[in-house]
Swiss-Prot record:
InterPro entries: Ribosomal_bL28/bL31-like_sf, Ribosomal_bL31, Ribosomal_bL31_A, Ribosomal_bL31_sf. One of its GO terms (molecular function) is structural constituent of ribosome. Pfam families: Ribosomal_L31 (PF01197). This is Large ribosomal subunit protein bL31. GO terms for cellular component: ribonucleoprotein complex; ribosome. Binds 1 zinc ion per subunit. Binds the 23S rRNA. It comes from the Bacteria. Part of the 50S ribosomal subunit.
């Protein structure tokens, strides 16, 4: 392998909005996530509303002018 072309692989902390902190190694410095293994709805069995309004609004704006005609 060539030297000097690979990104630096360093210790990283992954922080979830629930407060869980995971230490691992990555090429990124610090990573912030919305859902982790401690608060994921499938694992905890609790219902959690995930905000996807931004994506839905962008989709609706993008396809607002498209007619719903079937050929």
């Amino acid at each position: 392998m060539k030297e000097g072309i690979h990104p630096e692989y360093k210790e990283t902390t992954i922080t979830c909005v629930c407060g869980n902190v995971i230490t691992t190694r990555s090429t990124k410095q610090d990573i912030k996530v919305e859902i982790c293994s401690q608060c994921h709805p499938f694992i905890t069995g609790k219902q959690k509303i995930i905000d996807t309004a931004g994506r839905v609004e962008r989709f609706n704006q993008k396809y607002a002018g498209v007619n719903n005609k079937k050929a």
